[in-house]
Regions:
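Non-catalytic cap/lid and distal C-terminal segments of serine-dependent acyl enzymes
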Residues: 2-3, 12-339
Length: 339
Protein backbone atom coordinates (compact mmCIF):
# COMPACT_ATOMS: atom_id res chain seq x y z
CA UNK A 1 0.00 0.00 0.00
CA UNK A 2 1.41 3.40 -0.98
CA UNK A 3 0.49 6.04 1.51
CA UNK A 4 1.47 8.79 -0.88
CA UNK A 5 -1.85 8.25 -2.60
CA UNK A 6 -3.62 8.88 0.70
CA UNK A 7 -1.33 11.52 2.00
CA UNK A 8 -2.11 15.19 2.30
CA UNK A 9 1.33 15.65 0.77
CA UNK A 10 1.14 19.40 0.61
CA UNK A 11 0.29 19.59 4.28
CA UNK A 12 3.10 17.26 5.26
CA UNK A 13 5.57 19.22 3.17
CA UNK A 14 4.38 22.30 5.01
CA UNK A 15 5.29 20.53 8.22
CA UNK A 16 8.72 19.75 6.84
CA UNK A 17 9.27 23.41 6.04
CA UNK A 18 8.01 24.60 9.39
CA UNK A 19 10.08 22.10 11.30
CA UNK A 20 13.20 23.14 9.43
CA UNK A 21 12.61 27.18 10.24
CA UNK A 22 24.45 5.01 33.45
CA UNK A 23 23.69 5.87 36.66
CA UNK A 24 26.35 4.20 38.82
CA UNK A 25 25.54 3.33 42.46
CA UNK A 26 28.50 3.21 44.86
CA UNK A 27 28.47 0.82 47.77
CA UNK A 28 28.94 2.18 51.30
CA UNK A 29 30.93 5.13 50.08
CA UNK A 30 33.59 2.90 48.52
CA UNK A 31 34.67 2.58 44.92
CA UNK A 32 32.84 -0.66 44.16
CA UNK A 33 29.92 -0.28 41.75
CA UNK A 34 26.70 -2.21 42.17
CA UNK A 35 25.95 -4.70 39.42
CA UNK A 36 22.70 -3.72 37.69
CA UNK A 37 19.91 -6.31 37.74
CA UNK A 38 19.66 -8.60 34.72
CA UNK A 39 15.93 -8.07 34.38
CA UNK A 40 13.75 -4.99 34.57
CA UNK A 41 13.35 -3.81 38.14
CA UNK A 42 12.72 -0.78 40.29
CA UNK A 43 16.11 0.16 41.71
CA UNK A 44 14.94 3.03 43.92
CA UNK A 45 11.81 4.86 45.03
CA UNK A 46 11.72 8.41 46.36
CA UNK A 47 8.36 9.46 47.75
CA UNK A 48 7.26 13.09 47.67
CA UNK A 49 3.73 13.18 48.98
CA UNK A 50 1.58 11.23 46.55
CA UNK A 51 4.26 11.44 43.85
CA UNK A 52 6.67 8.52 43.65
CA UNK A 53 9.89 9.01 41.72
CA UNK A 54 10.95 5.58 40.46
CA UNK A 55 14.22 4.51 38.92
CA UNK A 56 13.53 1.54 36.66
CA UNK A 57 16.38 -0.47 35.19
CA UNK A 58 15.91 -1.30 31.50
CA UNK A 59 17.91 -4.35 30.37
CA UNK A 60 17.35 -3.51 26.70
CA UNK A 61 18.96 -0.07 27.13
CA UNK A 62 21.19 -1.03 30.07
CA UNK A 63 20.33 2.08 32.04
CA UNK A 64 17.94 3.42 34.64
CA UNK A 65 14.86 5.31 33.48
CA UNK A 66 13.09 7.85 35.66
CA UNK A 67 9.37 7.18 35.94
CA UNK A 68 7.27 9.58 38.00
CA UNK A 69 3.98 8.25 39.36
CA UNK A 70 1.13 10.25 40.83
CA UNK A 71 -0.58 7.75 43.10
CA UNK A 72 -4.39 7.51 43.15
CA UNK A 73 -6.68 9.35 45.51
CA UNK A 74 -7.21 6.07 47.39
CA UNK A 75 -4.14 3.84 47.27
CA UNK A 76 -5.61 1.21 49.57
CA UNK A 77 -7.09 -0.64 46.60
CA UNK A 78 -5.77 -1.50 43.13
CA UNK A 79 -5.98 1.23 40.52
CA UNK A 80 -5.31 1.24 36.77
CA UNK A 81 -2.32 2.91 35.14
CA UNK A 82 -2.62 5.95 32.89
CA UNK A 83 0.59 6.34 30.87
CA UNK A 84 1.14 9.96 29.79
CA UNK A 85 3.92 10.34 27.23
CA UNK A 86 5.48 13.72 26.54
CA UNK A 87 6.41 15.02 23.09
CA UNK A 88 9.74 15.30 21.32
CA UNK A 89 11.49 16.64 24.43
CA UNK A 90 10.34 13.51 26.33
CA UNK A 91 10.05 15.39 29.62
CA UNK A 92 13.78 16.01 29.79
CA UNK A 93 13.21 19.77 29.69
CA UNK A 94 10.18 21.84 30.61
CA UNK A 95 8.06 20.92 27.59
CA UNK A 96 6.06 18.39 29.58
CA UNK A 97 2.60 17.62 30.90
CA UNK A 98 3.89 18.50 34.35
CA UNK A 99 5.36 21.90 33.51
CA UNK A 100 3.07 23.15 30.74
CA UNK A 101 -0.38 22.07 31.94
CA UNK A 102 -2.46 21.61 35.08
CA UNK A 103 -3.53 18.07 34.25
CA UNK A 104 -1.81 16.54 37.27
CA UNK A 105 -3.90 18.74 39.55
CA UNK A 106 -6.99 17.80 37.56
CA UNK A 107 -6.18 14.09 37.83
CA UNK A 108 -5.39 14.26 41.54
CA UNK A 109 -8.87 13.14 42.62
CA UNK A 110 -9.05 10.31 40.08
CA UNK A 111 -8.65 6.67 41.06
CA UNK A 112 -5.68 6.10 38.78
CA UNK A 113 -1.89 5.87 38.82
CA UNK A 114 -0.59 8.60 36.50
CA UNK A 115 2.60 7.28 34.88
CA UNK A 116 5.05 9.89 33.55
CA UNK A 117 8.23 8.44 32.00
CA UNK A 118 11.16 10.83 31.65
CA UNK A 119 13.69 10.33 28.85
CA UNK A 120 13.87 9.35 25.20
CA UNK A 121 14.32 12.79 23.70
CA UNK A 122 13.90 12.69 19.92
CA UNK A 123 13.46 8.91 19.88
CA UNK A 124 9.78 8.64 18.92
CA UNK A 125 9.71 6.10 21.78
CA UNK A 126 10.54 3.31 19.34
CA UNK A 127 13.19 0.59 19.08
CA UNK A 128 16.15 1.93 17.10
CA UNK A 129 18.14 -0.54 15.04
CA UNK A 130 21.52 0.91 16.01
CA UNK A 131 22.95 3.07 18.80
CA UNK A 132 23.00 6.73 17.83
CA UNK A 133 26.10 8.87 18.45
CA UNK A 134 23.92 11.66 19.85
CA UNK A 135 20.82 9.96 21.23
CA UNK A 136 22.44 6.73 22.41
CA UNK A 137 20.69 3.36 22.68
CA UNK A 138 16.93 3.59 22.21
CA UNK A 139 14.76 0.55 22.87
CA UNK A 140 11.69 2.36 24.13
CA UNK A 141 9.16 0.05 22.51
CA UNK A 142 10.67 -2.87 24.38
CA UNK A 143 10.73 -0.81 27.56
CA UNK A 144 7.09 0.26 27.34
CA UNK A 145 5.62 -3.02 26.09
CA UNK A 146 7.73 -5.64 27.87
CA UNK A 147 9.84 -4.24 30.70
CA UNK A 148 7.91 -1.47 32.43
CA UNK A 149 4.30 -2.78 32.68
CA UNK A 150 4.96 -5.84 34.87
CA UNK A 151 7.32 -3.83 37.06
CA UNK A 152 4.65 -1.17 37.61
CA UNK A 153 1.93 -3.73 38.26
CA UNK A 154 4.07 -5.32 40.95
CA UNK A 155 5.33 -2.10 42.54
CA UNK A 156 2.02 -0.23 42.48
CA UNK A 157 -0.24 -3.26 43.00
CA UNK A 158 -2.23 -1.92 40.07
CA UNK A 159 -5.41 -3.39 38.63
CA UNK A 160 -3.87 -4.62 35.37
CA UNK A 161 -5.86 -2.22 33.20
CA UNK A 162 -4.06 0.55 31.32
CA UNK A 163 -4.59 3.60 29.13
CA UNK A 164 -2.02 5.44 27.02
CA UNK A 165 -1.90 9.07 25.91
CA UNK A 166 0.55 10.98 23.74
CA UNK A 167 0.86 14.32 22.00
CA UNK A 168 2.71 15.59 18.95
CA UNK A 169 5.47 13.06 18.14
CA UNK A 170 4.28 10.75 20.92
CA UNK A 171 0.84 10.94 19.33
CA UNK A 172 2.49 8.78 16.68
CA UNK A 173 4.27 6.67 19.29
CA UNK A 174 1.16 5.68 21.24
CA UNK A 175 -0.40 4.20 18.11
CA UNK A 176 2.81 2.32 17.31
CA UNK A 177 2.97 0.96 20.86
CA UNK A 178 -0.67 -0.12 20.77
CA UNK A 179 -0.03 -1.97 17.51
CA UNK A 180 3.11 -3.58 18.90
CA UNK A 181 1.27 -4.96 21.95
CA UNK A 182 -2.47 -5.24 21.26
CA UNK A 183 -4.49 -5.51 24.45
CA UNK A 184 -1.89 -4.00 26.77
CA UNK A 185 -3.66 -0.63 26.75
CA UNK A 186 -7.45 -0.72 26.72
CA UNK A 187 -7.70 2.93 25.58
CA UNK A 188 -5.23 4.92 23.50
CA UNK A 189 -5.51 8.68 22.96
CA UNK A 190 -3.40 10.44 20.32
CA UNK A 191 -3.40 14.23 20.31
CA UNK A 192 -1.96 16.06 17.28
CA UNK A 193 0.14 13.12 16.11
CA UNK A 194 1.10 12.37 12.50
CA UNK A 195 0.42 8.65 12.14
CA UNK A 196 1.71 8.07 8.62
CA UNK A 197 5.49 7.86 8.55
CA UNK A 198 6.49 5.61 5.65
CA UNK A 199 5.71 7.69 2.55
CA UNK A 200 8.31 10.30 1.48
CA UNK A 201 6.53 13.23 3.11
CA UNK A 202 5.93 11.30 6.33
CA UNK A 203 9.55 10.18 6.44
CA UNK A 204 10.65 13.76 6.03
CA UNK A 205 8.45 14.81 8.94
CA UNK A 206 10.08 12.24 11.23
CA UNK A 207 13.53 13.00 9.88
CA UNK A 208 13.29 16.72 10.46
CA UNK A 209 11.87 16.27 13.94
CA UNK A 210 14.48 13.75 15.06
CA UNK A 211 17.48 15.06 13.13
CA UNK A 212 16.96 18.81 12.97
CA UNK A 213 15.59 19.27 16.47
CA UNK A 214 17.15 16.43 18.46
CA UNK A 215 20.37 15.84 16.49
CA UNK A 216 19.82 12.12 15.93
CA UNK A 217 20.03 10.13 12.70
CA UNK A 218 16.92 8.32 11.51
CA UNK A 219 19.08 5.83 9.60
CA UNK A 220 19.87 4.46 13.06
CA UNK A 221 16.14 4.37 13.79
CA UNK A 222 14.57 2.57 10.82
CA UNK A 223 17.33 2.55 8.23
CA UNK A 224 17.37 4.36 4.86
CA UNK A 225 14.17 5.50 3.18
CA UNK A 226 13.95 2.22 1.26
CA UNK A 227 14.02 0.07 4.41
CA UNK A 228 10.84 -1.96 5.04
CA UNK A 229 11.09 -0.97 8.71
CA UNK A 230 9.40 2.33 7.89
CA UNK A 231 6.25 0.54 6.76
CA UNK A 232 6.57 -2.02 9.54
CA UNK A 233 6.32 0.86 12.03
CA UNK A 234 3.70 2.96 10.23
CA UNK A 235 0.47 3.11 12.28
CA UNK A 236 -1.66 3.75 9.18
CA UNK A 237 -0.26 0.76 7.28
CA UNK A 238 -0.69 -1.45 10.35
CA UNK A 239 -4.02 0.00 11.50
CA UNK A 240 -5.70 -3.43 11.62
CA UNK A 241 -3.73 -4.06 14.83
CA UNK A 242 -5.72 -1.28 16.52
CA UNK A 243 -8.93 -3.29 16.30
CA UNK A 244 -10.38 -3.85 19.76
CA UNK A 245 -8.67 -0.84 21.33
CA UNK A 246 -10.74 2.18 22.35
CA UNK A 247 -9.31 5.05 20.31
CA UNK A 248 -9.48 8.82 20.77
CA UNK A 249 -7.79 10.83 18.03
CA UNK A 250 -7.70 14.62 17.82
CA UNK A 251 -6.19 17.41 15.75
CA UNK A 252 -6.67 21.11 15.19
CA UNK A 253 -6.78 22.99 11.91
CA UNK A 254 -3.79 25.29 12.34
CA UNK A 255 -6.02 28.38 12.45
CA UNK A 256 -5.03 30.45 15.49
CA UNK A 257 -7.24 32.13 18.04
CA UNK A 258 -6.30 35.31 19.86
CA UNK A 259 -5.22 33.14 22.80
CA UNK A 260 -2.64 31.53 20.50
CA UNK A 261 -1.21 34.90 19.54
CA UNK A 262 -1.05 35.91 23.20
CA UNK A 263 0.49 32.59 24.25
CA UNK A 264 3.25 32.61 21.66
CA UNK A 265 4.06 36.25 22.38
CA UNK A 266 4.21 35.56 26.12
CA UNK A 267 6.65 32.71 25.52
CA UNK A 268 8.85 34.61 23.05
CA UNK A 269 8.03 38.32 22.70
CA UNK A 270 8.66 40.03 19.40
CA UNK A 271 9.59 38.50 16.04
CA UNK A 272 10.47 35.09 17.49
CA UNK A 273 6.96 34.77 18.86
CA UNK A 274 5.59 35.44 15.39
CA UNK A 275 7.88 32.77 13.92
CA UNK A 276 6.84 30.27 16.59
CA UNK A 277 3.18 31.00 15.94
CA UNK A 278 3.75 30.28 12.26
CA UNK A 279 5.41 27.00 13.14
CA UNK A 280 2.53 26.02 15.40
CA UNK A 281 0.05 26.82 12.67
CA UNK A 282 1.89 24.93 9.93
CA UNK A 283 2.62 21.83 11.99
CA UNK A 284 -0.96 21.50 13.21
CA UNK A 285 -2.35 21.96 9.69
CA UNK A 286 -0.10 19.12 8.53
CA UNK A 287 -1.10 16.97 11.49
CA UNK A 288 -4.74 17.37 10.53
CA UNK A 289 -3.95 15.98 7.08
CA UNK A 290 -2.25 12.97 8.66
CA UNK A 291 -5.15 12.46 11.03
CA UNK A 292 -7.74 12.56 8.25
CA UNK A 293 -5.75 9.89 6.43
CA UNK A 294 -5.68 7.75 9.57
CA UNK A 295 -9.45 8.14 9.92
CA UNK A 296 -9.97 7.12 6.30
CA UNK A 297 -7.86 4.03 6.85
CA UNK A 298 -9.66 3.03 10.05
CA UNK A 299 -13.03 3.66 8.42
CA UNK A 300 -12.08 1.42 5.49
CA UNK A 301 -11.28 -1.36 7.97
CA UNK A 302 -14.45 -0.83 9.98
CA UNK A 303 -12.48 0.07 13.11
CA UNK A 304 -14.35 2.58 15.29
CA UNK A 305 -12.70 5.55 16.95
CA UNK A 306 -13.69 8.81 18.59
CA UNK A 307 -12.42 11.82 16.63
CA UNK A 308 -12.14 15.47 17.54
CA UNK A 309 -11.34 17.71 14.59
CA UNK A 310 -11.28 21.24 15.88
CA UNK A 311 -11.95 24.04 13.36
CA UNK A 312 -9.21 26.05 15.06
CA UNK A 313 -6.04 25.36 17.03
CA UNK A 314 -2.27 25.39 16.78
CA UNK A 315 0.35 22.87 17.88
CA UNK A 316 0.56 23.78 21.55
CA UNK A 317 -0.15 22.64 25.08
CA UNK A 318 -3.50 24.30 25.87
CA UNK A 319 -5.13 22.28 23.11
CA UNK A 320 -3.64 19.02 24.36
CA UNK A 321 -4.81 19.80 27.88
CA UNK A 322 -8.31 20.36 26.49
CA UNK A 323 -8.05 17.11 24.52
CA UNK A 324 -7.14 15.16 27.65
CA UNK A 325 -10.24 16.48 29.40
CA UNK A 326 -12.40 15.64 26.39
CA UNK A 327 -10.96 12.13 26.09
CA UNK A 328 -11.21 11.36 29.80
CA UNK A 329 -14.57 9.52 29.62
CA UNK A 330 -13.13 7.11 27.05
CA UNK A 331 -9.88 6.73 28.98
CA UNK A 332 -11.83 6.01 32.16
CA UNK A 333 -14.04 3.51 30.34
CA UNK A 334 -11.05 1.53 29.20
CA UNK A 335 -9.49 1.61 32.65
CA UNK A 336 -12.72 0.47 34.27
CA UNK A 337 -13.20 3.47 36.55
CA UNK A 338 -15.81 6.19 36.92
CA UNK A 339 -15.39 9.20 34.68
Amino acid sequence: MKLSSLCGAAALRTAAVTLTAMVSVTLLGGTAVATPPKSAAVTSITKEGRTWHLKVYSPSMDKEITVDVLRPADDSKPAPNLYMLNGLDAGEGTASWKDRTKVLDWLADKQVNVIQPIGGRGSYYTDWQNPDPVLGVNKWRTFFTEELPPVLDKTLQSSGRNALTGLSTSGTSVLQLAEAKPGLWQTVAAYSGCAQISDPAGQQYVKLATELWAGGNTVNMYGPASSPLWQDNDPVVNAEKLRGTLLYISAGSGIPLMRDVQLYQSEAPGPQGVVNLGLGMGIEAAVKGCTVNLKNRLDSLGIPATYQFSPVGTHNWPYWEDALHESWPLLAQGMGIAS
